Amino acid sequence: MFYPLIMLLFHYLAILCRKVLVALVLVNIISINIFSSIAESAEPISIKQFVAEASFRNNHVSQFYESRNYDPFWLGNNVDNVARLQALISALSDAPMHGLPSSKFSLNRILSDIYGVSYNEKLGYLDVKLTLVFLEYASVMTTGVLIPEKIDKKIVRANFYKKNISFLKELQSSDSFEFFKKLFPPSLEYKRLMKEKKRLEKILLSGGWGAFITSDELLVGERGNGVVMLRNRLISMGYLSPTYSASYDLPLVKAVKNFQLDNGIRADGSANQSTLNLINITVEERLKSVLVALERERWSRTLSVNRHVIVNLTDFSAKIVDSGKVTFKTKTVIGFDDSNRRSPEFSDILEFMVVNPSWYVPRSIVVQEYLPMLKVNNNAVDFLELRDEFGTIIEPSEIDFSTFDQNTFPYRMRQPPGVNNALGLVKFMFPNKNNIYLHDTPSKGLFDLDVRAFSHGCIRLSDPFGFAYTLLAAQSTDPASLFRSALGFKKEVKIELEKPVPIHLIYRTAITKPGGGLEFRKDIYGRDAKIWDALQVEGVVLVSVTG
């Protein structure tokens, strides 16, 4: 048989050349020729019959083929069919570049299914199979390989779901190659992550960043083998120009500082153990973070392009972004790393702010934290008001708290407005089922720490006034005066945003830099580790594994 020889030739050349481009070109040429040649020898009426039978099990696919009078969608010499097939094969060839499971979209598997095909029955089956592979590819590219909530219940993303028949109808009426491009996440971050993935893969295949640093700590001015190992690793990472210096000198201090900045830790230029541990992280681990970030971008197609707020939990930061540019940034404190206190990921609409807010204590905090304290001392939380179901203030001294448990405690708690209020002097509201919001805090000292996971889930802002001024600048020529006027009332004042602002609580451990390169953050809640494990189960692999 001629075609088995072609297949063997393809495998031989792909292995011999070890060049992806050559392999992909061969795949395209061979695949198109095989598909087209088989279709030429088939009987059209019989093909339609078997297309109808093969598509019967999938209602959407069956409806689509019925609308085409069961004409093949991919096979044959029809110009549109050939163009669609070329675009599909090109897309499937590139699937691993996007961090998709290579096994699911393997051209070898599809080609093996048509090996020796000579019957209309198999040809009809093949056209339908190509349709099913296409639909899976389109779904994965537009919504992700995984379902976020199945990985972690606190990852809530409104995925860009589309019915199968919609993909097929759009492809049928579109330029094939342009259609496949539109399936990609539209964000600039996705494009940058693709470039960084390719860069890291090249580094990985060339041996990585070199030997690990074995020292526990290195001091400025120190000389020796440990400093040389630090120097060489930072040179490999691109933080230091090639040098033979064996001294922890000023250029090396600067390189360490830049590395620390890119990893979200205190940039003091000292190579302490925590910094050295980060420098020793392998290319493989960094590449995993990028693959997870690509998957997260596929979950987040709805992120705004105009004014929006981004709260990156791992970066402990909140940003206001206008037309792609960060116009305001402040430090944050996020939820403590505990199953009940971790901050969730979701998107919503920031609608208003409350100046001089009261704190209505969540019941979980009331019964789990404050009730045990009140059982010991009736005045333990005298900074809070105790109220009954009618809103009447109750004196704690009149209550025997020992008679209540978490289920029977009947009272609510409120902290009045004031400088010592747990919410500070302002809160920013985007009403949601998680009861999460952004707010000021009287505990400013926590913002001096690198890792700031201390709250019950809400997001504390280091500079809430600046955040408020930037938001209000869209509706006032003097936002500071507007805000401070409300502050002067010493009671709750609600300020509506004339144009509500989309807000996104995200979780990124790999973040691209505009000029190239990556920043990394700690997987504070372990969510990315769970995502990577799930991606592996689905068949996503590192380049070193694929060859």
Name every feature range the model reports, one short phrase each:
Residues M1-C17:
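N-terminal secretory signal peptides that target proteins for export/translocation
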Residues F10, V117-E121, L218, T243:
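Short coil/turn segments at secondary-structure junctions
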Residues H11, C17-V20, S36-A39, V51:
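Short, intrinsically disordered, low-complexity terminal segments
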Residues K19-N33:
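Bacterial N-terminal signal peptides
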Residues I38-E66, V128, L132-L135, I155, ...:
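Well-ordered beta-sheet/strand-loop patches within structured domains
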Residues S41-F160:
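Cationic-aromatic interfacial patches
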Residues D152, N164-L171, F180:
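Phosphate-/polyanion-interacting regions in eukaryotic proteins
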